[in-house]
Amino acid sequence: MEAKAIAKYVRMSPMKVKIVLDLIRGKNVNEAFAILQYTPKDAAVVINKVLKSAVANAENNFNLDGNRLYVSEAYAGQGPTLKRFQPHAQGRAFSIKKRSSHITVIVKERD
């Protein structure tokens, strides 16, 4: 059985989020929480919140044992991009893309 949690429209680039997700994928849930606690990235705070939600979903909705859970899948997809312009000299303008992410964490029980 698996439980899933999704955070949508997170104002963070998916590329930056994937760096942290790669650290916890396949790890035991308790080990993943320890890794996220000491990871000096802004994405670690958001991923920690999503992982807590996935564990709570597993325990409350599917009656799974929290100590036997592991992160089976963790991925970040591209959300909508906000387009902004930075004015430059002589009437020029350069575009700025403020990217967002949809973060998904799936936990399963070890056999």
UniProtKB/Swiss-Prot annotation:
Single annotated GO MF: structural constituent of ribosome
Gene Ontology CC: cytosolic large ribosomal subunit
SUPFAM superfamilies noted in UniProt: Ribosomal protein L22
Cited function: This protein binds specifically to 23S rRNA; its binding is stimulated by other ribosomal proteins, e.g. L4, L17, and L20. It is important during the early stages of 50S assembly. It makes multiple contacts with different domains of the 23S rRNA in the assembled 50S subunit and ribosome. The globular domain of the protein is located near the polypeptide exit tunnel on the outside of the subunit, while an extended beta-hairpin is found that lines the wall of the exit tunnel in the center of the 70S ribosome.
The keyword Ribonucleoprotein belongs to this UniProt entry's keyword annotation: yes
Keyword Hydrolase: no
Designated name of the protein: Large ribosomal subunit protein uL22
